[in-house]
């Protein structure tokens, strides 16, 4: 027996040795999937298979490269070099270049990347004289991509009544015509996009059986990694290549199928043994990564799914501690709890910062944790994306803020003059820039007096520029007397940004909407903090001063020093960390509200949670309240917390997991007064008021009962209390309080008088704060 087989456990060895027909290897998290694939290929090479007769398909170039390197160490670099191993797209492009003439392309056809594809679609929309604010190129591109992934060509798309009705409902009925033109233009240009590499491979094999047989005969053994992530087109091509000889091994885990939004079809793996009746099923059930407790917790979670291939994952590692669940009072406190815990674990156990990850459901959640880590001096990085204040939509809004505070800001001016689109093109902008350079004045100065500075304009262009000038002038005038939070909302609404981002209801655009809302939430937090500290009129200039420092920090630290990783759970799949914090475990956040009542989507959300917790050490957290849509909302713990067997959780003392929404809402109404906080608006699901804003930006969100804390009346006389001093309106040193955003804390001292009466409070997670009682929102814990 080959020596390396001794390194495998019994289940792994059985999967490697079997090569008499189709096989499905279900590989649980941390079960040695890559090792099995690597050793299986090495075993095939050691048992008569030539390297060029083995096809191994992966989803990333990195996975293919690492696997090839491992194989080379087993069988030698020379033999490993000739393996057909790579991503679906790289392998199929290689085949298509060889056989291009059979489908009417040259061997040198161009491959369009996503940007090229989008640019062509944008040009076609313009040629068809369609409104690109309605027919957004990104949305059209996504629809065409989805059609191709289902092997639906332009004729089939046009003939589909269901698709046409969907496009009509989205007010983009001409997508089928755009798709046809796009298809034709790609062919005219001798070009394929990434999706075409799949489509044309399928067409090649379907229309030329002799070529299909050629490659099926060449690839005597086909292996596919991460089979649960394959789409319909990939699945069909695998069938084409393996139908004759049936030597195929697919590896994956249905419990980790989380990419349906990219076209992945879980049925491909669930129904594999139905398509290949003689297939053998192997289950890799030993987890080498996580503690026994985490494995059992994950098992108890995923067993709630109906559609799955049942398996009993186990671990022989240490038993481990129960998973700690942090119950934060607010989203702000949740960030502080996580930042403090990371700092604590690093100090006590000697972990490096890069051994920590904070996982969230949506990108917009990163802001809270970025700011908490910054305050704690903990370095971090955003994995696979930009930090909150570097995202395009955020920079667009900040540019408007900058222009309101300083209309002479050239970079902000250029960024927003035609965003949202208002018909002011580059030609007009360049005229303004040239005039400003010649006369050595600001762009704003030229905008106000174009004729004075020699800028010739048509009547229509002059009208558009005047409207933009009036818009900005209104913001400039408001800066000196309107609070930052209210003005921020006004700018986002009146500039047209809200209309622009809510006009596109696609899932692809949801992240932008959430980020804009989170920016305004952050402005509310900033104003509320400053108000409680005694600053009664916080202006946009104050907010921008703070944000400028944050964005400057974002551009620093591009070194390789260890950092905490912040990322969405979707981005985290396949990565390993010693310590993971899964945050925001609340209804209408995780599971995503977009899942609705669809059991299929809810099961995918549960699989997403399963992927998140299957790490070495795991911590979970949720917040009782979040500032959403312009008001403080009571949050319900995620149903997924109840799915986990409580024996494996270290739950908060208050059994909030089992409490119903109605009971919690009643309790909070009894405890708190009904005063509306200064920075809280009405009952609309959106924080943005006004007729031009969609009434319900997200129809699927049901506002929860508001969590309102009473304001403590200011003291009538001058005080300076100690633990033994008399109480002032019930507020004195030594008292425990519960604050709307900072949670539980103890009053250290009270000083000042009347409107200037302040309390110094040491909070469990937020540290020491000085609160102006006139504005502070907390209740005394009796």
Model-based region annotation:
Residues 584-768, 775-782:
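C-terminal accessory regions
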Residues 6-17, 21-25, 36, 55-56, ...:
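Conserved helicase NTPase motor core
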């Amino acid at each position: 027996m080959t020596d390396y087989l001794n390194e495998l456990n019994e289940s792994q060895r059985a999967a490697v040795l079997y090569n008499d027909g189709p096989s499905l290897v279900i590989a649980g998290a941390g079960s040695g999937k890559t090792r099995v694939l690597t050793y299986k290929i090495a075993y095939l090479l050691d048992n008569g298979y030539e390297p060029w007769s083995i096809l191994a398909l992966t989803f990333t170039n990195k996975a293919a490269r690492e696997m090839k390197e491992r194989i080379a160490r087993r069988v030698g670099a020379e033999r490993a070099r000739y393996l057909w191993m790579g991503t679906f797209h790289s392998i199929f492009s290689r085949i298509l270049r060889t056989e291009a003439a059979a489908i009417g392309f040259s061997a040198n056809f161009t491959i369009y990347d996503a940007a090229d594809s989008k640019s062509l679609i944008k040009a076609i929309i313009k040629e068809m004289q369609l409104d690109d604010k309605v027919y957004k190129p990104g949305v059209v591109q996504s629809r065409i991509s989805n059609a191709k992934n289902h092997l639906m060509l332009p004729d089939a798309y046009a003939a589909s009544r269901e698709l046409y009705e969907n496009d009509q409902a989205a007010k983009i009925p001409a997508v089928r015509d755009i798709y046809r033109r796009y298809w034709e233009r790609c062919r005219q240009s001798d070009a394929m996009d990434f999706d075409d590499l799949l489509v044309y491979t399928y067409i090649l094999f379907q229309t030329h059986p002799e070529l299909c047989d050629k490659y099926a005969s060449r690839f005597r053994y086909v292996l596919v990694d991460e089979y649960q992530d394959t789409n319909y087109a990939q699945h069909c091509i695998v069938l084409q290549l393996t139908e004759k000889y049936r030597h195929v091994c697919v590896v994956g885990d249905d419990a980790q199928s989380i990419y349906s939004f990219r076209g992945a079809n879980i049925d491909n793996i669930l129904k594999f043994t139905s398509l290949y009746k003689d297939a053998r099923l192997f289950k890799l059930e030993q987890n080498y990564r996580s503690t026994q407790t985490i494995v059992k917790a994950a098992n108890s979670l995923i067993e709630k799914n109906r559609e799955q291939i049942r398996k009993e994952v186990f671990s022989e590692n240490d038993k481990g501690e129960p998973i700690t669940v942090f119950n934060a009072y607010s989203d702000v406190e949740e960030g502080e709890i996580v930042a403090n815990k990371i700092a604590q674990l690093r100090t006590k156990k000697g972990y490096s910062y890069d051994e920590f990850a904070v996982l969230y459901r949506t990108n917009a959640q990163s802001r809270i944790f970025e700011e908490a880590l910054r305050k704690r001096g903990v370095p971090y990085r955003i994995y696979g994306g930009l930090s909150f204040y570097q995202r395009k939509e955020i920079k667009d809004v900040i540019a408007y803020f900058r222009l309101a505070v300083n209309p002479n800001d050239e970079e902000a001016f250029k960024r927003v003059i035609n965003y949202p689109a208002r018909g002011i093109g580059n030609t007009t902008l360049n005229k303004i820039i040239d005039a400003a350079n010649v006369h050595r004045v600001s762009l704003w100065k030229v905008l106000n007096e174009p004729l004075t500075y020699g800028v010739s304009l048509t009547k229509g262009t002059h009208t558009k520029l005047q409207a933009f000038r009036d818009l900005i002038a209104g913001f400039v005038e408001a800066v000196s007397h309107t609070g930052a939070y209210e003005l921020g909302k006004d700018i986002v609404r009146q500039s047209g940004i809200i209309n622009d981002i809510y006009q596109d209801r696609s899932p692809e655009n949801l992240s932008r909407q959430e980020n804009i809302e989170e920016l305004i939430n952050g402005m509310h937090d900033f104003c509320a903090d400053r108000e409680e500290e005694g600053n009664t009129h916080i202006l946009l200039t104050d907010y921008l001063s703070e944000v400028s420092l944050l964005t400057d920090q974002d551009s620093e630290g591009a070194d390789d020093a260890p950092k905490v990783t912040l990322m969405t759970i979707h981005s985290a799949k396949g990565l390993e960390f010693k310590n993971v914090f899964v945050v925001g475990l609340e209804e209408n956040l995780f599971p995503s509200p977009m899942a609705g009542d669809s059991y299929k989507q809810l099961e995918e959300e549960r699989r997403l949670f399963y992927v998140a917790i299957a790490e070495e050490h795991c911590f979970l957290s949720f917040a009782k309240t979040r500032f959403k849509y312009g008001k403080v909302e009571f949050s319900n713990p995620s149903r997924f917390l109840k799915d986990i067997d409580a024996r494996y959780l270290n739950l908060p003392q208050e059994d909030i997991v089992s409490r119903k929404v109605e009971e919690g809402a009643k309790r909070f109404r009894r405890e708190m007064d009904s005063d509306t906080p200064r920075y809280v608006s009405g009952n609309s699901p959106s924080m943005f008021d006004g007729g031009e804003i969609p009434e319900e930006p997200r129809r699927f969100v049901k506002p929860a009962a508001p969590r309102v804390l009473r304001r403590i009346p200011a003291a009538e006389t001058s005080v300076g209390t100690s633990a033994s001093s008399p109480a002032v309106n019930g507020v004195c040193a030594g008292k425990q309080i519960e604050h709307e955003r900072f949670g539980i804390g103890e009053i250290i001292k009270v000083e000042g008088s009347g409107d200037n009466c302040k309390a110094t409070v040491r909070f469990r997670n937020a540290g020491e704060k000085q609160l102006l009682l006139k504005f502070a929102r907390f209740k005394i814990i009796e």
